């Protein structure tokens, strides 16, 4: 957000070899202005505000970012005070519902004419206005914060990067947009990951204690059964193995219930501060196949460790003592 690129430089970048053209021959790229504004959040304490990122974009923004789609309303008309809002903030801030108006700055009102989605990315927590509207409102005439463009193919990225990065006149750094936002969200992701691990460790420890307590109770109730099996010739290892397997399957059953409950979180949106841009970001949790299988594996391990000591106690039980009850 702190970078400044002159409009003349934008034209040089878009004229570079490898930039993709649309059906009219115009380059699929544009300069963008990025500014953070404070806006009153609905449902919070009166007067409480949160930071919202406003992005000044070109008329071809939906062509530059084909993964962004309108889910309500229409695209803004060029040269008007109209804007789009991401579905993550639409209706959650004063004046940001479809058809409402809010001020970018004092006496700079804009009207929300459309709501867009962007595959769950941070774009869904932004306001998009015409770049000239943003420049005028925030005093950025003749300047942009960044340049976003599409290339003919991903294979041309290295050549384009070398062409732009080595140009001393431009003095710019080229990055994939996904890479840039991954770097921007590292602080937030690290915080969420750290909190998640702390909660997971405590929950795992509690789950193992619960499994251990359950299996100790099961061993005590089935003491005669264990003695009978030992008298019939079943080895200590067979007894131990059977109780560990039982504990593991019980843990897996609990894990499946937990996974079912966690999948419901995909329908819940959470808001928090991005520590790099200081904007409020709205997101939802996505359960990937690897995460689901990893969770089940962790549940199985908790069942194994939680059931081992009770199983060991059962295996060491004397057949005669067990038969006496």
Regions found by a protein language model. Give the residues of each.
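Transmembrane alpha-helical interface segments in multi-pass membrane proteins
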Residues: 209, 216-218, 223-270, 294-306, ...
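Hydrophobic secondary-structure segments that place a key small or acidic residue at a functional site
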Residues: 29-36, 48-60, 66-133, 140
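Hydrophobic alpha-helical transmembrane segments
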Residues: 137-152, 196-202, 233-251
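Residues that define the loop-to-transmembrane-helix transition and helix capping
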Residues: 193-194, 224, 237, 290, ...
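Peri-transmembrane interface segments
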Residues: 153-208, 218-220, 229, 237
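Hydrophobic, regular-secondary-structure patches
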Residues: 1-53, 72-74, 79, 136, ...
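Short juxtamembrane loops and helix-capping segments at transmembrane helix boundaries
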Residues: 266-293
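Short cytosolic juxtamembrane segments of multi-pass membrane proteins
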Residues: 312-325
């Amino acid at each position: 957000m702190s970078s400044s690129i002159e409009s003349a430089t934008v034209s040089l970048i878009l004229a570079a070899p490898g930039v993709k053209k649309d059906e009219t021959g115009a380059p699929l790229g544009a300069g963008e202005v990025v500014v953070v504004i404070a806006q009153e959040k609905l449902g919070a304490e009166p007067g409480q505000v949160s930071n919202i990122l406003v992005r000044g974009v070109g008329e071809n923004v939906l062509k530059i970012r084909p993964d962004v789609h309108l889910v309500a309303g229409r695209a803004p008309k060029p040269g008007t005070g109209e804007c789009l809002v991401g579905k993550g903030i639409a209706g959650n801030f004063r004046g940001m519902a479809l058809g409402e108006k809010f001020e970018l700055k004092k006496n700079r009102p804009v009207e929300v004419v459309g709501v867009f989605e962007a595959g769950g990315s941070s774009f869904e927590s932004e306001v998009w206005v015409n770049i000239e509207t943003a420049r005028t409102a925030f005093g950025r005439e003749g300047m942009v914060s960044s340049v976003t463009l599409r290339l003919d193919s991903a294979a041309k990225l290295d050549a384009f990067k070398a062409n732009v990065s080595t140009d001393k006149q431009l003095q710019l750094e080229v990055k994939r947009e996904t890479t840039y936002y991954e770097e921007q969200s590292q602080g937030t992701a690290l915080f969420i990951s750290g909190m998640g691990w702390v909660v997971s460790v405590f929950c795992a420890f509690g789950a193992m204690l619960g499994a251990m307590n359950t299996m100790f109770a099961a061993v005590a109730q089935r003491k005669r059964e264990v003695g009978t099996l030992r008298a019939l010739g079943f080895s200590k290892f067979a007894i131990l193995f059977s109780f560990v397997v039982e504990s593991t399957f019980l843990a897996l059953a609990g894990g499946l219930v937990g996974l079912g409950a966690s999948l419901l979180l995909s329908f819940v949106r959470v808001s928090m501060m991005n520590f790099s841009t200081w904007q409020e970001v709205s997101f939802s949790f996505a359960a990937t196949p690897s995460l689901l299988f990893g969770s089940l594996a962790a549940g199985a391990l908790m069942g194994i460790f939680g059931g081992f000591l009770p199983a060991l106690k059962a295996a060491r039980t004397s057949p005669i003592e067990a038969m006496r009850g």
